[in-house]
């Protein structure tokens, strides 16, 4: 099972009640640690293609949920410095606004121009739904709209295929997994799925407290937990 790291925001902060923010300095050190361990961060599409071809050794999936504006201003320059790629999961109904679903500090989300800029830089843009709702609480019509309309909006924006999805809050039952597959997504990222698979890929949370020792422990724990192939 692929090793996939899950980030959200990379920015300076005073309060972070949901632990979604990593400081720019910490993030830079985390990326430096990956490089020192001869690991290369890549987007999910590249990772899964390499995994299928048996060429995933030394690769780590890097994912960023929600599409915060600081991805373009803070995270992207560091990724480019190290020659790393990543996947950013965008909430299409909130482009250019803020994280209205969150009761924590307000954080700006990427504008359409910023999304195009990161896509042009080689970052994979994928869907995080339209409104960042917990999908198990939706009816069939709303679920289909969250999946299909968000992808259509992103494909028009980046003028290319959008093949990945990430479940908001990591909430997914077999119903949502089946719906994502039926909607034509090639893969989907979860957090800690009961039954890991290509449309419910586990990810390892990374926060501001994660220095080298904690990162190494998380990598080892992943290797022990997930030994099967996608």
Model regions and ranges:
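C-terminal active-site subregion of NodB/CE4 polysaccharide deacetylases
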Residues: 1-63, 68-73, 137-230
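Histidine-centered catalytic micro-motifs
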Residues: 5-6, 125-132
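Acidic (Asp/Glu)-rich catalytic clusters
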Residues: 35, 76-83, 108-127, 181
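Active-site glycine- and acidic-residue-rich loops that bind
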Residues: 66-70, 100-109
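Generic beta-sheet signal
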Residues: 89-91, 128, 190-191
């Amino acid at each position: 099972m692929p090793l996939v790291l899950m980030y959200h925001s990379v920015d300076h902060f005073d309060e972070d009640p949901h632990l979604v923010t990593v400081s720019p300095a910490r993030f830079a050190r985390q990326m430096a640690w990956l490089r020192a361990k001869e690991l290369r961060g890549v987007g999910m599409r590249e990772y899964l293609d390499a995994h299928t071809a048996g060429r995933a050794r030394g690769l780590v999936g890097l994912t960023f949920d929600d599409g915060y504006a600081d991805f373009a201003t803070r995270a992207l320059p560091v990724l480019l410095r190290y020659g790393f790629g990543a996947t950013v999961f965008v909430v299409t109904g909130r482009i250019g606004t803020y994280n209205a679903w969150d009761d924590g500090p307000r954080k700006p989300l990427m504008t359409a121009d910023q999304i195009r800029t990161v896509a042009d830089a080689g970052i994979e843009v994928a869907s995080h739904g339209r409104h960042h709702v917990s999908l198990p609480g939706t009816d069939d019509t709303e679920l289909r709209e969250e999946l299909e309309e968000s992808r259509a909006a992103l494909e028009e924006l980046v003028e290319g295929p959008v093949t990945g999805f990430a479940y908001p809050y990591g909430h997914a039952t077999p119903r949502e997994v089946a719906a994502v597959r039926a909607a034509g997504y090639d893969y989907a990222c979860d957090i800690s799925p009961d039954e890991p698979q290509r449309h419910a890929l586990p990810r390892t949370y990374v926060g501001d407290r994660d220095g080298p020792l904690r990162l190494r422990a998380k990598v080892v724990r992943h290797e022990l937990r997930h030994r099967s192939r996608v």
